[in-house]
Amino acid sequence: MKKSVLIYLFALLPFTVGAQIKLNLNRNTPMQKLINAEMAINQLYVDTVDEKRLVEEAIRGMLGSLDPHSSYATKEEVKALQEPLNGNFEGIGVEYNMIEDTLLVIQPVVDGPSEKAGIMAGDRIVSVDGTPIAGVHMSKEEIMRRLRGPKGTKVRLGIRRQGFDEELQFRVTRDKIPVKSITATYMLRPGVGYIRIGNFGATTHEEFVKSLQKLQKLGMKSLVLDLQENGGGYMKAAVDVANEFLQRLDLIVYTDGRERSEFRAKGNGRFRVGSLIVLVDEYTASAAEIVTGAVQDQDRGLVVGRRTFGKGLVQRQITLPDTSMIRLTIAHYYTPAGRCIQKPYVKGKSEDYAMDMQNRLRRGELMNADSIHFADSLRYYTLRQHRTVYGGGGIMPDYFVPLDTTIYTRYHRALQARSVVLNANLRYVDDNRRELTEAYPTFDLFKQSFEIPKSVIDNIVEEGEKLDIKPQDKAEKKKTLDYMKLQLKALVARDLWGMDEYFAIMNESSPIVQAAIGLITNN
């Protein structure tokens, strides 16, 4: 507290060269040393100094010497970081993609301001308040700046719609737009529900309860909880979700720093009975690992997939006077069995820490469980069935599913990187939306009988050749195109219905999801 006050007071001091520095030099404290150095550089350095940048770099340097996750964010970065976790932002409410320098509406947010104003899927937004935004090479950031704004303010949108020659005008009143952290909820099989959580934000628990209730009404007895690629978020949200699975007073997680805190289940969870499988991969981190660790250590369910990221540090967000922020590690968290799952790091060597995923791939850990080794000192036991588990570097799943390296070929990655596949899908849906909705009035019919036309695939290949993107051989081409047909079918389903339908198609070929279904089916 004293240090933050000193920093704030220093910002208010007059910059009197000489006397002030001489006075401060007589005070021998680490904080005063830092202040003196900044004052000397700012007032005496031969060239003009950007003081704001100087201070920010000093803060980054201090935090970088602590651990890999203590960090500094400017006020602009703070807004971008917090938006997915806060649960809402203020704007017009559309899901969109950019195609050929034009904003194409994929879906208006249900009950959002754009839907209420009459904007439809497939519309192209070509102007905002009379200013053209299509065909003028305006940056995505600038377009978003024009579309977003405080709740209650109005914006006039120029729309190009198929079947109309003239530009249509819509007046939209901006409002709070929910940012969903649950990206899919549907029934995988009769009696088996599926929920995918993208991150743990302010509204995650509320969304999760609604998803549970929806699936339970559809007859769910078993649940597959997908935390793949979930990078974490708010610890409280993770604790609240874990509470839904556990019995009263079951330990969920505890933190240990300058103080120790325990978080236990309240006994009011909505899915305390029933088969539970948690899906994880190498990008499952932080808050997502709290849920995973609680389920595994309490023997509440099985963990399926690959070893998780290994982030066992708790950060506190501290807002600075200019609304920039530091995230400071204040504790380690531990799973119920006492495991700290933070992977090893050396202070000040963030580059080595960042190479962990490449090192796992190089060692074969993503393809073979036998390539993963834990020291005996990191051995722990689950609390009910006393199964062996390990700490010190992520959570090892109960059932390992290797990374399918045959899906993502070099050819496919190159096409994806240049947005060839995405743009082909957008053009196809845009040109055929009416015909598709008439031919496939229900998703079940679409899933059962729709196939991507060969002409779409041929166009992707031709577009790739124009960009000098070619397969190495016939085998790579066949493998890529087979997977691309599935991917495109899922993308069309997303554009016509939503993300539930997208995952309902993609998961039919997911090795991890299919492994989970097999475990539930075979008890």
Question: Where are the model-predicted features located?
Answer:
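Cleft-lining beta-strand/loop regions that shape enzyme active-site pockets
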Residues: 19-30, 34, 38-51, 74, ...
